[in-house]
Amino acid sequence: AVIDLRKDSKTYGEIVHQVIAPTTGDEFHHFGWNACSASLSPLSGHAFLERRYLIVPGIRSSRIYIFDVKDPLKAKIHKVIEPEEVFEKTGYSRPHTIHCGPEGIYVSTLGGSGEDGTESPPGIFIMDCETFEIIGIYELDRGEQDKHYDFWWNLPQDYMVSSEWGLPPQFENGVVPEDLVGGKYGHKIHF
């Protein structure tokens, strides 16, 4: 929904436009832009990219929506990436957080392969910031990391920091008390 935040407007505080997703059960989570300061660097190859598209992951469905918000009062779905494409090109599921970066759009996931997302570890994949095609996985070697959550990087030092949360069975239907007490949720950061 688009809410009017212009204080002098007659529709201030009201919903002035909506975009309805064509499917149910996606559970939208941690949206992000196609362009930001990390992607607009002259060294990135797309220094003049327009901050126009909102990337919205469906954490339960593994579907990703690309919303064109150039005109917020006419926002619309530009593209939908279906779960099968995410699985096929990355081996990951449950996309969680979107960050734009120097090589494209980075997407952290909470699930790996398999129906419940636990047959392989989750991770990060990259999408092209102009075509929104999935390029592939980011990690060359994830080391011992078997859970994932959010991430950010120190570009001048050329390293990424990522955190852990839990695997899909540990959050999709609420916290699992035994896992919480047993220390089975994520509690590390990785560099």
Language-model features: where?
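Short loop/turn positions that demarcate and connect the beta-strands within blades
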Residues: 16, 22-25, 90-92, 143-146, ...
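Beta-propeller domains
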Residues: 1-37, 47-49, 56-82, 119, 141-191, ...
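Beta-propeller blade signature
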Residues: 2-3, 120-132, 180-191
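Structural signature of eukaryotic scaffold interfaces centered on beta-propeller domains
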Residues: 27-50, 91-102, 151-158, 167
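Short, conserved, GDST-rich strand-edge loop motifs in beta-rich repeat architectures
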Residues: 1, 42-52, 56-57, 108-120, ...
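Asp-box/WD-like beta-propeller blade repeats and closely related beta-sheet repeat scaffolds
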Residues: 69-155
